[in-house]
Structure formats: C-alpha cells, structure tokens
C-alpha cells in the first residue's frame, strides 16, 4: 500500500535572477540584484585542497568554526555558539525549538519570520514599537532592520530583554547585517536567559 506524498512548497526567496530574466528578456544588462543581501563581490576564496570537499565536517571542524564565530562576533566565553546552514535555516527551526502561541515582530521587516511561525500555528502580529513586543511569547527584531536599516539601541534592547525575561518570553534579535555597524551589536545579551542573537557570515564575507 502506498500513500501520496504532498511536496513541500519551495521557499520563495530573493535572488531569483533566472525568473526575472525570463519575465523581462529585453531588460538592460548586467542586472543589479537588490532582492537579496548576499555580497556580490565576496572575498577571494583560498586554494582549498579538494579533500576539503569530499567529507562531512568532524567535531574538530565544528569547534574551529564556532571559535571563529566567537572571535569575529566578540561573543562572551560563557555563551553558547551554535553554527548552522545560514540564518534562514534557523528561522525555520526556531518555531519548533521555541513553540509559541503569540509572536510579535517589529515591522516592516524580513517576512520569513512571520511565515515560519505562522506555518507552525502561532498567531503572528506585526507591531510598530518596541513596547508592543513585550506582550508576546516570542518577540523578534531584525537589527539593523532589513530592508530599511532601522536600528534599535543597545539600551533599548537591554530594557526589552529584561521585560521579556520577567514574563518568561523569548527575545530573538537578528543581527544579520550587524557586520556593517558592529559597535551596535548586543551579542553579550545572550548571557542572560531568554535571548538569542542570530549572525550571518554571508552578508559581509
């Protein structure tokens, strides 16, 4: 006996120049892609040995990566660093690691947080002020914000984290673009319970 399998819809994301070229075949070239935050001029890759591509990373390789992230982001020694396949992967995992009934997102912002928590059955609210985040089980702020660069101060986020902790809530701070203004990072806030900070190698490197 067999059962039909419904395929999971492909995640819509930026950077689909192939689709844009098909839709607008007469557009001038080269295209300037503003739909994704990936650096179009990355640092030159070193001459890696081919053996680096023939096996999965072992524990030592993960430890090296975590140490590199800790040093790059000035993460305190007492906090846990978790590496993954990009911030997008964590966005999709968060609703399952931190189930929530009500999620508040400081908007207008990156839409994948709302989509992921809605898919997990949460009520998602887009709010306009930091004060409105406090009433939710999970509060999400992209800082600096994508796409407009809005930036909440360390003082504001510290106060918000304290208020969320008093309610037993989770504050998720997405610092994917913080490499461009690193002095505003609040990665040290993760030393307290109920705060996670997401960082991205791909935006700057």
Residue ranges and their predicted role:
Residues 53-165, 172, 177-202:
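Conserved core of the PLP fold type I
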